[in-house]
Amino acid sequence: MARMGGRRHLKTLAAPKFWPVRQRAGIFTVKPSPGPHPIERSIPLLILVRDVLGYAKTAREARKLIAEGHFKIDGRVRRNYKYPVGFMDVIEIVDTGEFYRVLPYPTRFFTLHPISKEEAQFKLGRIEDKSTVKGGHIQLHLHDGRNVLIRVSDPTNPVEAKPYKTLGTVKISIPEQQLLGYAPLEVGSLVIIFGGRNVGRVGRIVSIQPGMRRRGIVTIEDARGEKIQTSLEYVFVIAPPNEEPWISLPEGAWK
């Protein structure tokens, strides 16, 4: 028997707990379409517009606003109301000139942090993997599905790509995807935790205990001197050692 593929519908009770939807709103809710972020770390654009930003009272109103192109994600108009919005994405309200960055946040799991127009010109991407493409150039695969090409002059000795390591962070312009900077995952780097019970905490790496694949343990120290341990999988570098965060953070998250 042929497989039917994934389900097109999502029951409200099965939705991630951080989605601001209630059971009384209906049996079913919006299921994100396949895209840059997994369902457990994203929220559909419709729910963001209606329930988080409050620009619509009903799903029909939200779909209409989205279809008319009033919202940009990472510098591009998105008209798919199921589009998954996730960590580090930059949201622009075209008509009002407001900008937000999606950040991890304690208890609520995520927050829309207001940012300036200047800061909205770039985003951070965690390097999940690297590969060699035609011509010997190196391609970086980021956490949001983007691919950034590093051109090398000598494929046998790709010195241009050697600084870029897995789980490090690149700073790129949006939507052009020009490389603006790189922050490695190492002792002294400033990170934000985007998973587990310490989600939203910010601190500098004190030590990294290696483990199988990404199951290592990272110890970070926050601004109050408190030490926190979390999985290597949950840390996102937001600045290299001896530098302040590349992005603005919610009040109280850092110094």
UniProtKB/Swiss-Prot annotation:
A single GO BP term for this record reads: translation
InterPro entries tied to this protein = Rib_uL2_dom2, Ribosomal_eS4, Ribosomal_eS4_central_region, Ribosomal_eS4_central_sf, Ribosomal_eS4_KOW, Ribosomal_eS4_N, S4_RNA-bd, S4_RNA-bd_sf
- List residues of the S4 RNA-binding domain: 43-115
Show the SMART domains listed in the entry.
Answer: S4
Q: Name one GO molecular function term.
A: structural constituent of ribosome
GO cellular component terms given for this protein: cytosolic small ribosomal subunit
Keywords in alphabetical order: Ribonucleoprotein, Ribosomal protein, RNA-binding, rRNA-binding
Record PANTHER family: 30S/40S RIBOSOMAL PROTEIN S4, SMALL RIBOSOMAL SUBUNIT PROTEIN ES4
Into which family does the record put it?
Belongs to the eukaryotic ribosomal protein eS4 family.
Protein name according to UniProt: Small ribosomal subunit protein eS4
Q: What organism does this protein naturally occur in?
A: Hyperthermus butylicus (strain DSM 5456 / JCM 9403 / PLM1-5)
Taxonomic lineage is:
Archaea, Thermoproteota, Thermoprotei, Desulfurococcales, Pyrodictiaceae
